[in-house]
Amino acid sequence: MEKQIEILNVPKRVLFTGEEIPAVGLGTFGSDKYSAEQVSEAVYGAIKYGYRLVDCAAVYQNEKQIGEVLKKVFQDKVVTREELFITSKVWNDRHREVEAACRQSLEDLGLSTIDLYFVHWPFPNYHAPGCGGDSRNPDSKPFSVEEFM
């Protein structure tokens, strides 16, 4: 018999809105070591076995594949949308385009809502293809609500 997480035993935290968020979830970062397909398989398995929080981000470059997984778990009646808590994040180069970035994540994930949308990293930055992870755009400046929101 396959084991599942006892969903009622997963601790939750209450957000200032009153909404509950599972204290344990699945992060979908893995694009540095795993293919989007491998991450997708992990997401399907995690949801099947009881995970209810899925943490995504456009910069991981796998939201479209995760969207396909979400569609499948809903079609397979593994869970309903209301049973999941989905997060995503705006990346460094989209601080001035938060709404457009969020809409893109919604489209890629195949959702009408994201439960929580974070600023991924509060410093604007541009990473050219193939550059090192520490390279910075010389015009970067720290994130501020006044400047970027």
Predicted segments with their positions:
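A short, structured active-site edge motif that brings together acidic residues
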Residues: 80-94, 115-122
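N-terminal binding-site loop/beta-alpha segment at the start of enzyme catalytic domains
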Residues: 1-84, 99, 112
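Short, surface-exposed alpha-helical recognition segments that flank or form part
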Residues: 34, 57, 93, 143-147
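Feature marks short, surface-exposed loop/turn motifs that line or immediately flank catalytic pockets
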Residues: 30-33, 60, 92-94, 120-125
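Generic structural signal for short, solvent-exposed loop/turn connectors between secondary structure elements
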Residues: 62, 89-100, 148
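Glycine/proline-rich, positively charged
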Residues: 99-149
